[in-house]
Amino acid sequence: MSVDGVLNVLKPPGMTSHDVVDFIRKIYGIKKVGHTGTLDPDAAGVLPVCMGRATKFTSYLMEHDKRYRFEITFGFSTDTLDKSGKIVESGPVPLFTLEKLQEVLSQFKGEIQQIPPIYSAKKVKGKKLYEYARKGEEVEIPPIKVTVYELELIKYDAPHHLLLDVKCSKGTYVRALVRDICKKLEVPGHMSFLIRTEVGDFDIESSYTLEEIKEGKAEVQPVDKFIKFPSVELDEVSSNKILNGQFIRNTYNVENSLVKLYDNHGIFIGIGVAEGEKIRPKRLF
């Protein structure tokens, strides 16, 4: 069975992102399957999965911004920063004013620095951070730069629960955001709920449950639909040159940019690099 495209999967809580990939492999009977960005096992939500030749372009889909709905529960913090971990601190919970909450949240908008959670797959010195954590080894975690485009207070269920919505750049750790918000509020807390509602143009409304996928109700989308580069349609001669690994003359009014390349029938053939007067192939479909 030849399946080349992207599936917008609604990952349920309790499964790893790799579990979802294995599920898709079995359902479609194909080996080449890869997701476009890990979602924590306890989290649910949008997980775009590339299949077949579309897996060549997974890295381009990983660049997309993401949106999450999440809940902070005040009263205790954990080593994993979510509800699955061991309690490391507990304390009384004050009643916050909405003004105080908004004032603190405003400090996390724009470009910020985060320390990734120790229980994460982020690599430091060649090892994943959770490997250090499981062995009880100390490691210095360098901060990363991320961008928070939107951070909205959805509901304050006083005094213990805060529901928020965030739109952020790739690589943002929501658990770390929760940790840092709690630190600013001077109250122990953890992330008690997380759902990813958007990854670029993939949204939760158009995602498919595993049951729908199993029943054959899911629609596989063409991967180029979700790659955000300028499009260039080539004539037959130029298409053949690109497919044979050769460069072509850049007469398409695109400069110093990655471009989506289409043949003279409008069929996607890959990604090219426009450099000055030339366009060369970078990754072919």
UniProtKB/Swiss-Prot annotation:
Keyword Acyltransferase: no
Domain of life the protein comes from: Bacteria
Active-site annotation: D40
Keyword Cell cycle included in the entry's annotation: no
Transmembrane regions listed in the UniProt entry: none
GO molecular function: RNA binding; tRNA pseudouridine(55) synthase activity
Catalytically driven reaction(s): uridine(55) in tRNA = pseudouridine(55) in tRNA
Assigned EC number: 5.4.99.25
Keywords noted in UniProt: Isomerase, tRNA processing
Any one Gene Ontology BP term: tRNA pseudouridine synthesis
Family, as annotated: Belongs to the pseudouridine synthase TruB family. Type 1 subfamily.
PANTHER family reported in the protein's UniProt record: PSEUDOURIDYLATE SYNTHASE TRUB1, TRNA-PSEUDOURIDINE SYNTHASE
Cited function: Responsible for synthesis of pseudouridine from uracil-55 in the psi GC loop of transfer RNAs.
HAMAP family registered for this protein in UniProt: TruB_bact
Protein name: tRNA pseudouridine synthase B
Organism: Caldanaerobacter subterraneus subsp. tengcongensis (strain DSM 15242 / JCM 11007 / NBRC 100824 / MB4) (Thermoanaerobacter tengcongensis)
Gene: truB
